[in-house]
């Protein structure tokens, strides 16, 4: 997302500006190694641009600086910034999911905005200790699915900018492994090391 008063109104305009002046536009994230940071690196790689990346200690101070005009852009969890987007304080240039987010239907997906095949989605799941009996896992999953399908709970998540998705434990495990592979590739590419 970017500050609402930026002259670039679309992702392609923002990318063109970044290509015309490599390293001059700023882009914040919520901290080194966060989902936002890794998504940001994937975006820069996919778009073929160089931004002056600034790692903050969380999304809140970054969005404050964005709204204050001290930053050109930032990547963060869309649900965390939904209030600012919906209030028109910042402009969403794209969402990183394959589908538009119901809370802000006018914000295009990365693919719609001109980044074919780009998708990077953070998600939450329920985990249990290793060795938990499969029947307990299945009961926990059934309860979670039932809760997420409850209309009021489902709508509350959508209104907050979340996209509730249900699935099986096997699907969650497959998704986890696929995400670890994709994120591992970007971690290796940028040379990120634990400290």
Predicted regions and their residues:
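Hinge/capping helix and adjacent helix->loop/strand transition within the periplasmic-binding protein
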Residues: 1-61, 110, 123-156
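An extracytoplasmic/periplasmic, membrane-proximal ligand-sensing/linker region
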Residues: 46-47, 86, 134-195
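Paired acidic/hydrophobic, glycine-rich loop segments that form the ligand-binding mouth/hinge
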Residues: 26, 72-76, 92-94, 183-184
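Short helices/loops that flank or line small-molecule/ion binding pockets
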Residues: 42, 46, 60-70, 74, ...
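Conserved beta-strand segments of alpha/beta enzyme cores
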Residues: 26, 50-52, 91, 163, ...
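Short beta-strand and adjacent tight-turn residues that come in two discontinuous sequence segments
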Residues: 56, 75-76, 95, 120, ...
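C-terminal lobe and pocket-closing loops
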Residues: 9, 81-149, 178-181
């Amino acid at each position: 997302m970017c500050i609402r008063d930026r002259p670039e109104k679309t992702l392609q305009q923002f990318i063109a500006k970044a290509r015309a002046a490599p390293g001059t536009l700023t882009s914040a994230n919520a901290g080194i190694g966060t989902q936002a940071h890794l998504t940001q690196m994937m975006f820069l790689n996919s778009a073929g641009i160089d931004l002056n990346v600034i790692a903050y200690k969380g999304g809140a101070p970054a969005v404050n600086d964005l709204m204050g005009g001290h930053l050109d852009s930032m990547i963060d969890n869309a649900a965390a910034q939904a209030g600012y987007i919906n209030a028109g304080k910042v402009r969403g240039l794209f969402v990183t999911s394959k589908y538009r987010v119901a809370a802000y239907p006018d914000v295009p997906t990365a693919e719609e905005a001109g980044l074919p095949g780009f998708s990077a989605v953070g998600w939450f799941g329920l985990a249990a200790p290793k060795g938990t009996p499969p029947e307990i896992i299945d009961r926990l999953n059934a309860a979670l699915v039932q809760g997420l399908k409850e209309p009021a709970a489902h709508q509350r998540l959508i209104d907050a900018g979340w996209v509730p998705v249900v699935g099986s434990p096997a699907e969650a495990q497959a998704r986890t492994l696929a995400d670890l592979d994709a994120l591992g590739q970007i971690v290796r590419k940028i040379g990120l090391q634990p400290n």
